[in-house]
């Protein structure tokens, strides 16, 4: 199975993050990382199955106001308690229809490339100074993060932008190139911080580290000049034992230098 076929078979709600239930402890880490406080007005964009995040933001971190945004009405049936809870505001609108001008902390689960540029424009237009946007894995667009504890990324408004991908990688990872060891360590940290079950952790680390490195290779920001032996080995493991073929991900030929 080619990687695009593998992804196509994943339900879209999983890709968007809507149908993923995240451990409450992960949200506690995120809120501590973002320094959520009683002075903050918190918005969770596309909160999906994670009403628990809204509850924790209000009850444990005492956020001044809490808003859960979701554009799909059928999804809200899972959150009748929240809809009836006056301390938590549920808004059934698409993100682009919601006024974010009073938000001081925003959590956006996944950075959809197709929405990224539109969201950055919306944030630039509506957010007040010092508003914090928390994303996972990467900032929005070419925004330079204000703070990083991978996979948690915080960007503070007004945003500053990288002039090239290496500058952004330096800000996220602390170095201007990505080697396979770094990719593996980041994948391990993601699995640990997101508290992924041990049953799936090894597979997740292998696949994620490969995707991280291959994407860096295609962008010509790997530290290696050629495809290293571990990448070739894990490509074979994924193909042989998991029936996942990553060949189509390689846009560059292995003879091209970074």
Q: Which residues make up each language-model segment?
A:
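S-adenosyl-L-methionine
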Residues: 1-38, 73-101, 235, 250, 258
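Conserved class I S-adenosyl-L-methionine
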Residues: 38-48
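Conserved SAM-binding motif I beta-strand of class I
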Residues: 65-70
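Short SAM/SAH-binding signature in class I
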Residues: 100-113, 117
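C-terminal substrate-binding/active-site "lid" region of AdoMet-derived donor-dependent transferases
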Residues: 113-175, 179
């Amino acid at each position: 199975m080619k990687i695009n076929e593998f992804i196509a078979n994943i339900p879209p709600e999983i890709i968007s993050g809507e149908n993923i239930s995240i451990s409450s402890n992960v949200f506690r880490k995120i809120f501590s990382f973002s320094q959520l406080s009683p002075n903050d007005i918190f918005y969770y964009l596309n909160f999906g199955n994670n009403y628990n995040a809204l509850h924790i933001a209000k009850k444990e971190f005492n956020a001044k106001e809490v808003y859960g945004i979701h554009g799909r009405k059928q999804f809200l049936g899972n959150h009748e308690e929240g809809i009836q809870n006056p301390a938590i505001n549920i808004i059934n609108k698409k993100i682009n229809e919601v006024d974010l001008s009073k938000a001081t902390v925003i959590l956006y689960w996944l950075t959809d490339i197709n929405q990224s540029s539109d969201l950055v424009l919306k944030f630039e237009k509506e957010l007040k100074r010092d508003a914090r946007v928390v994303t996972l894995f990467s900032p929005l667009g070419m925004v330079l993060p204000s703070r990083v504890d991978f996979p948690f990324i915080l960007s503070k408004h007004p945003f500053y932008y990288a002039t090239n991908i290496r500058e952004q990688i330096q800000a996220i990872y602390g170095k201007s190139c990505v080697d396979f060891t770094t990719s593996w360590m980041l994948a391990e940290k993601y699995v640990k911080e997101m508290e992924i079950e041990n049953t799936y952790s090894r597979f997740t680390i292998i696949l994620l580290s490969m995707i991280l490195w291959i994407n860096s290779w295609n962008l010509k920001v790997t530290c290696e000049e050629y495809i290293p032996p571990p990448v070739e080995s894990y490509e074979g493991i994924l193909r042989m034992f998991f029936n996942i073929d990553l060949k189509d991900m390689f846009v560059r030929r292995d003879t091209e230098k970074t």
